[in-house]
């Protein structure tokens, strides 16, 4: 009957509206950090070379703002910092890393720095720094 037909049309329109709304919501990409360079090989390094400074850029490739929660390393000899903690979509930043190997013995060394964010895609991005520490 006519009332059943109207109910079907209303339900169809509601379903189509819901699907359209869902597809628009899903088209937004969550906040995500993309680091330009994640591995550094410094080669042969001497004790007397002092503190090593490394930097790399990153970009928020998502459609919403990303927040840097913390930057941690696997060793107190290595630290990292960014110039700010909040990056709107499409913006770039730089992480500056300092590595002081003066207390280490000659050996192959690998250090890791993690940038923790509020991205739902990945909890952190990791940067790896390698070198071979030589005696003076």
Role assignments for model-derived ranges:
Residues 105-133:
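Terminal connector regions
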Residues 26-61, 133-136:
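Beta-sheet-dominated interaction scaffolds and their linkers
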Residues 61-64, 103, 119:
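Short, acidic/polar linear motifs in exposed loop/turn regions
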Residues 63-92:
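Surface-exposed binding patches on compact interaction domains or structured appendages
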Residues 13-23:
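Bacterial N-terminal signal peptides
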Residues 3-15:
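Bacterial N-terminal signal peptides that target proteins for export
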Residues 95-103:
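Short, hydrophobic beta-strand segments
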